[in-house]
């Protein structure tokens, strides 16, 4: 196997270094001098008083010794507290339904200066072309958009139909790209544990970079084996003791708070002064409505401080420095001489009230980002084109026959969690013995002409109507849930007509729908417009019953076989604990 080039080492040219040194010595003029500022010390705790001198994209010096230093431009921080730019340790930008350009516009003014992104959603739909587009966006972004090379396309071989493959040869072509930091989440953890050569080949090929994990609920010898293969982190932990054990075994813990998977309350009590360098924050999947109304990583920091009494320097440490160290991004994560000048000025550090953001040494203006968004998106050459190769359906496509007295498996939803339970329900002439059981179906959309895979869903809260979407992890086939076959067909046909998207049907009519023209995953609308459309969708969905907080994101994970316990793919009902297909009828 070829040896990887470690692009995590950040190089400063000799000329840049000399210019920085001259300013640090007090012999040259800085580009910017941030005055009337207090720096939060993430290493020792406490604060550092004094200005921040900036040359180009780097910090030349900090502290009172730079009072009145010569500079081309002074920035009066008005007593603000300066912290390093926030870093999201693991996310799929596609889950925001925004393009990378729009995502930057929405999150950079909130202090999110760096993201570690796995674009496996779009790669599952269109293969290497999707990864190439994300790389183009990363190259032109002001935000530091780093990429982990998608490792499991599809998530689990032989379990679902997806739109494309992403071979090891294709992956290796991107390994040495300057925006690539490693190998994305290795979801086939049973294959890694059993030593499948195809998976070990991928781990070996990226061994000099960061190897992301994915092992919800794993423990014992299996967890030891998974870590022994070289896996370095996990963002799927949902239990306190699970997270503690992973830390004990040398794993880094990504504490996730997304729109559907909400694990911060369970895992935040683990964070302390000792282990905080091994703890990071991530969102994984967060929708535009929450970003607009609650925030992104800034919202997670706020909750650590206000709800879990995490000390300020520790909360901001896990939001920046810990992640930068883990991914070898040693030029990021601290406000210190020689580091990149990614700086967030806070008028209130406890409430994470962002006053101003600088990235790569330049102040960010939200209005400028918005004004340039359309042109920058066009420059990135998005991969437009209809990816829905599916003919319209009819109610008869969702017909299921049930025998009175028989017991049938039900996917039981846990609100605000990605895991499900595998339950069962007995059918009688009056229906099922549980009032909350509705229907679910997954339809492949890549031209294979498979019949819909149908099943039963409980606990979702759908009392009437139907919801359909082409966002369904990770293969992104069409998923639909409903109380009647007629309304399910209506919802599916609307997203087919839209070329992909989300839809709510109630009372036999489409109540709200959102087209997603890029891969059936992303909109080209502005962040504000998208948030408003999501608001309308959620309002329409709430009329269908007491659904999860984020019904479409929760629904999107009902077809992901690598998260237990029971899921439905385009090929049938899948037992995520036995890693095998099972039957709708309970026969044993």
From Swiss-Prot:
Annotated EC: 3.5.4.2
One example of a Gene Ontology biological process annotation: adenine catabolic process
Keyword Protein biosynthesis attached: no
Reaction catalysis annotation: adenine + H2O + H(+) = hypoxanthine + NH4(+)
Keywords: Hydrolase, Manganese
InterPro entries the record matches: Adenine_deam, Adenine_deam_C, Amidohydro-rel, Metal-dep_hydrolase_composite, Metal_Hydrolase
GO molecular function, one term: adenine deaminase activity
Cofactor(s) this protein requires: Mn(2+)
Cross-referenced HAMAP family: Adenine_deamin
Similarity annotation: Belongs to the metallo-dependent hydrolases superfamily. Adenine deaminase family.
Assembly information from the UniProt record: Homodimer.
Protein's recorded name: Adenine deaminase
UniProt source species: Escherichia fergusonii (strain ATCC 35469 / DSM 13698 / CCUG 18766 / IAM 14443 / JCM 21226 / LMG 7866 / NBRC 102419 / NCTC 12128 / CDC 0568-73)
Gene: ade
């Amino acid at each position: 196997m070829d040896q990887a080039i470690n692009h995590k080492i950040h190089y400063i040219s000799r000329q840049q270094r000399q210019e920085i040194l001259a300013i640090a010595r007090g012999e040259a003029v800085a580009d910017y001098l941030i005055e009337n500022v207090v720096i939060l010390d993430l290493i020792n705790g406490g604060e550092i008083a004094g200005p921040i001198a900036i040359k180009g994209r780097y910090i030349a010096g900090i502290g009172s010794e730079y009072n009145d230093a010569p500079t081309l431009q002074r920035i009066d921080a008005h007593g603000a507290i300066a912290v390093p730019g926030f870093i999201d340790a693991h996310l799929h930008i596609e889950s925001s339904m925004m393009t990378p350009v729009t995502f930057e516009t929405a999150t950079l003014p909130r202090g999110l200066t760096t993201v570690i992104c796995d674009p496996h959603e779009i790669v599952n739909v269109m293969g290497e072309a999707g990864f190439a587009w994300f790389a183009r966006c990363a190259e032109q972004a002001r935000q530091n958009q780093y990429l982990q090379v998608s490792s499991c396309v599809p998530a689990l071989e032989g379990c679902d139909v997806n739109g494309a493959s992403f071979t090891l040869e294709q992956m290796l072509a991107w390994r040495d790209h300057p925006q690539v930091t490693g190998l994305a989440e290795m979801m086939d953890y049973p294959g890694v544990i059993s030593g499948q050569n195809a998976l070990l080949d991928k781990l070996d090929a990226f061994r000099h970079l960061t190897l992301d994990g994915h092992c919800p609920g794993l423990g014992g010898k299996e967890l030891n084996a998974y870590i022994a293969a070289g896996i370095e982190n996990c963002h799927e932990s949902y239990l306190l003791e699970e997270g503690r054990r992973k830390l004990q075994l040398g794993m880094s813990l990504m504490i996730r708070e997304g729109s559907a998977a909400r694990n911060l309350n369970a895992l935040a009590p683990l964070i302390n002064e000792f282990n905080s360098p091994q703890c990071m924050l991530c969102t994984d999947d967060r929708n535009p409505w929450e970003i607009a109304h609650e925030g992104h990583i800034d919202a997670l920091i706020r909750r650590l401080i206000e709800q879990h009494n995490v000390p300020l320097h520790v909360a901001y440490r896990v939001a920046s420095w810990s992640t930068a160290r883990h991914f070898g991004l040693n030029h990021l994560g601290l406000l210190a001489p020689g580091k990149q000048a990614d700086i967030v000025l806070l008028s209130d550090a406890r409430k994470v009230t962002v006053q101003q953001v600088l990235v790569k040494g330049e102040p960010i203006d939200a209005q400028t980002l918005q004004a340039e968004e359309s042109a920058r998106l066009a420059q990135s050459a998005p991969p437009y084109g209809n990816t829905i190769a599916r003919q319209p359906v009819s109610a008869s496509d969702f017909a299921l026959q049930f025998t009175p007295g028989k017991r049938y498996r039900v996917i039981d939803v846990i609100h605000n969690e990605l895991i499900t339970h595998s339950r069962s329900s007995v059918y009688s002439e009056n229906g099922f013995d549980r009032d909350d059981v509705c229907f679910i179906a997954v339809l492949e959309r890549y031209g294979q002409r498979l019949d819909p895979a149908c099943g039963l869903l409980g606990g979702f809260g759908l009392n009437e109507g139907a919801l359909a979407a082409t966002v369904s992890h990770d293969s992104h086939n069409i998923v639909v849930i409903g109380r009647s076959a007629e309304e399910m067909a209506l919802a599916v046909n609307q997203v087919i007509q839209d070329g992909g998207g989300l839809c709510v049907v109630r009372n036999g009519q489409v109540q709200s729908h959102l087209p997603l023209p890029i891969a059936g995953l992303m909109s080209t609308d502005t962040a504000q417009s998208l948030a408003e459309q999501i608001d309308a969708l959620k309002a329409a969905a709430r009329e269908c019953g007491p659904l999860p907080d984020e019904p479409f994101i929760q629904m999107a994970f009902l077809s992901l076989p690598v998260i237990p316990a029971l899921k439905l793919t385009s090929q049938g009902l899948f037992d995520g604990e036995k890693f095998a297909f099972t039957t709708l009828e309970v026969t044993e």
